[in-house]
Structures are given as structure tokens and as C-alpha cells.
């Protein structure tokens, strides 16, 4: 029986790269890996209202550079930058090194897989009908420029006695085409009936050529210009 591979892991070093970008040997590798996990856990737990999509960690020399991609950067920065300074000090205590924080605004959270999945999970926890939440997310993504989207919800949906999986798809979502720019994320909804799992695939076009930084570059271009990155012409 065939199984779906993780679209992000499948495309690493093709048109995507890692969210932790550093090199270490021996004991330093394990220490830095644990630090990265603790940083991400703390950021997501401490700032649930900021709509954080991902945290990218780079370690040039003895500096730790943390980039937080969020739909509500004002929640992270706080009044006159007070909250971001507290966050920087806390992360510095966790890593034992100087921390540089960079906040990147996500202008279109409706086409960000992580934020879409988390939004559906939040609605399920508030007892919103799962079909309504899925359809609303699909319509918003397609309206704002996604070329295709697929959403899976699994668990005791609607309080049913037997767990099942429901899915909804619109547009085209290629799973095996490596040049496809497919954003993928998972989320959990902790309901009164148990845990429901949400998976989201969003197809944003194709990236031609071998460029591991292409996805990040397109995302940054979209934030600075405020327009959807155009699909590259076939050569």
C-alpha cells in the first residue's frame, strides 16, 4: 500500500532548505539540536496569539540568529519593542550566546499551510463544524492565489463514536513533482471527544531549476512587495 511522503522533506535541497542552518561536530551537534527544539517550543508556547508559521535558526560564529515568521508581528514586538527585548533576553539565557531576532510578517496567512492548519484546529476546539471550517479555509486560499489546496481531518469528527478521515481538495496538488512549490503542515485539535489531526497541502506554483533557497526567497519577496510571486515561465 502506497504512503504519502512529507512534501517538505522530499524537496529538501531541490527547492527548499532546512529551518536550522548551522554546522557542528561531536557533542556540539546534540547540544545545538536540543537548543533549537527548546527555542521553537518556547516561541510557539509563549506567543500563541502571534500566528507563528515557522522559526528559522542560523548560527554564524558565536551568534544565534532567530527569524520568526508570523502573521501578527505586533504581538511579538509589543509596545515600543518591550516584548521583543524580553524574548531576546530569554532566548539568550536558553542558548548561552548573543541572540539576534528578526521578525518577518506573513501578509497572506490564508495561503500558509501551518497557519491554515492551526486555524482549523482552533475552530474544531471551539466546536465549529469541521466541514464548514475546511470549506472556508479552501475558499480563502484559492481566492488569495493558491493554485491548489488539500485538507485532511482525522479523528472523532463531530463527536462520532468511530474515528474517520474526511478530506477536501480544490485545484491541483501534485505530490510527486519535485519542482512543485508545495507547502505542508500538520496541527492537532484537542476536543472533548479526543484529538483530531489536521493536514494541509497548498500548491503555490512551480520553481524551475535547482535552488534550495527558492522557497524562502519567494516568501520574502511576497512580504516586501505585497503581491503574489509570479509563476516562472517554462524554458
Swiss-Prot record:
Domain KH type-2 intervals: 39-107
Record keywords, A-Z: Ribonucleoprotein, Ribosomal protein, RNA-binding, rRNA-binding
SMART domains found in the cross-reference section: KH
GO BP field: translation
UniProt cross-references to InterPro entries, sorted A to Z: KH_dom (IPR004087), KH_dom-like_a/b (IPR015946), KH_dom_type_2 (IPR004044), KH_sf_prok-type (IPR009019), Ribosomal_S3_C_sf (IPR036419), Ribosomal_uS3_bac-typ (IPR005704), Ribosomal_uS3_C (IPR001351), Ribosomal_uS3_CS (IPR018280)
Listed Pfam families: KH_2 (PF07650), Ribosomal_S3_C (PF00189)
One annotated Gene Ontology cellular component of this protein: cytosolic small ribosomal subunit
Sequence similarity: Belongs to the universal ribosomal protein uS3 family.
Protein name per Swiss-Prot or TrEMBL: Small ribosomal subunit protein uS3
Coiled coil regions in record: none
Subunit structure: Part of the 30S ribosomal subunit. Forms a tight complex with proteins S10 and S14.
Gene Ontology terms for molecular function: mRNA binding; rRNA binding; structural constituent of ribosome
Physiological role: Binds the lower part of the 30S subunit head. Binds mRNA in the 70S ribosome, positioning it for translation.
Gene: rpsC
Keyword NAD: no
NCBIfam families listed in its UniProt record: rpsC_bact
